[in-house]
């Protein structure tokens, strides 16, 4: 996905492949005592609900339709979201939420048992009646049980949601729809997902000052593939190809190219710029997430890899041309009818954490395919995905 589900990496843990096997076997055994008792019915008018998704940016944005659905269903309840520091800025302005609970390091790379116990205590202090768990990790799914939350609804991937009172099967569908399945599992009506992000007024004002440029305004995000506890360079399209498309936007469309990226992405942006004949507006490393959202909101198009910024563009109403490699856009693609995902993969690709450079198909996407998609989206003639 844009930012993949970061599985927990406990300090001193075993190798991923061996651990996955052991976790799968252990979860199937652990779920037996949880299935002895019939779970209580979900409350008709809950007073306090928690959504639990520590990481990462794309996943959190894909959960915003669920946030809106819960608020529509229960206008007067207290609705909180437990999230890590990496993704917290994407929820700070969400009008449907009453509060945010910090997850610390849990679910965002390596963490200790003391980190885990501290989060259990924070969740217990919230006195929640129900928790919606959007993470596939059994340790994350176990948190609301340990915190004494009676109703636990969430994703059950391979039996890993053994502690949930309402386990929801993980089917082959878009991640945003999968999250909404958790609401439907307890009888909540949902609408077609629409991602949401709300820049602050001062962030929009800064974007206005920065982008007094010629249209079309095309944002290019050439980096990505980096999250807490994970680095996947196989998700990056070559910088020289971004450079060719960027020059065509400037020369053929008389537009403006805006390079975007976070701290640490400067080298990738520099690799694009040094291969260009024209000068882009380089904002790499200069913007907060909120300011990035405000800039994307003013752009006519965002071209980039499978990243959190891709989902952020959709959340502010900007169409996307997204280039995919090892991840599957049918699950993690831009969820917007105006957007296009370019992908040469297949279902035979291995799971993300086992992808090797020779497995990825991102370089199979050509400059001409990307350029054609850019023109098609800008002229509003795109088709939904692929």
Each model region followed by its residue ranges:
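Catalytic machinery of carbohydrate-active enzymes
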Residues: 1-386
């Amino acid at each position: 996905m844009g930012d993949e589900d970061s599985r927990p990496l406990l300090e001193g843990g075993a190798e991923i492949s061996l651990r996955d096997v052991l976790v799968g076997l252990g979860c199937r055994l652990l779920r037996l005592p949880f299935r002895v008792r019939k779970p209580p019915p979900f409350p008709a008018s809950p007073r306090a609900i928690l959504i639990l998704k520590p990481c990462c940016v794309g996943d959190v944005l894909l959960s915003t339709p669920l946030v809106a659905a819960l608020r529509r269903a229960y206008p007067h309840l207290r609705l909180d979201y437990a999230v890590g520091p990496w993704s917290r800025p994407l929820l700070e302005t969400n009008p449907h939420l009453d509060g945010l609970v910090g997850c610390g390091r849990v679910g965002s790379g390596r963490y200790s048992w003391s980190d885990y116990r501290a989060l259990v205590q924070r969740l217990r202090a919230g006195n929640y009646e129900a928790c919606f768990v959007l993470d596939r990790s059994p340790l994350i799914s176990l948190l609301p049980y340990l915190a004494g939350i009676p109703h636990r609804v969430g994703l059950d991937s391979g039996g890993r949601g053994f502690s949930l009172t309402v386990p929801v099967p993980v089917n082959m569908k878009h991640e945003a729809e999968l999250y909404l399945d958790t609401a439907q599992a307890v009888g909540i009506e949902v609408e077609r997902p629409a991602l949401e992000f709300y820049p602050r007024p001062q962030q929009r004002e800064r974007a206005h000052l920065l982008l007094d440029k010629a249209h079309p305004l095309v944002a290019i995000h050439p980096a990505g593939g980096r999250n807490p506890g994970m680095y996947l360079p196989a998700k990056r399209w070559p910088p020289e190809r971004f450079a060719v498309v960027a020059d065509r936007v400037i020369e053929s469309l008389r537009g403006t190219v805006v390079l975007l990226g976070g701290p640490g992405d400067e080298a990738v942006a520099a690799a694009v710029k040094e291969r260009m004949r024209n000068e882009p507006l380089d904002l790499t490393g200069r913007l907060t997430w909120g300011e990035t959202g405000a800039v994307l909101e003013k752009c006519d198009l965002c071209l980039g890899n499978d990243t959190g910024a891709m989902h952020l563009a959709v959340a502010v109403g900007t169409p996307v041309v997204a280039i995919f490699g090892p991840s599957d856009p049918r699950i993690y693609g831009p969820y917007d009818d105006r957007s296009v995902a370019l992908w040469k993969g297949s279902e035979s690709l291995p799971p993300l954490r086992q992808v090797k450079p020779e497995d990825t198909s991102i370089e199979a996407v050509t400059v001409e395919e990307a350029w054609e998609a850019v023109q098609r989206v800008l002229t509003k003639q795109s088709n939904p995905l692929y």
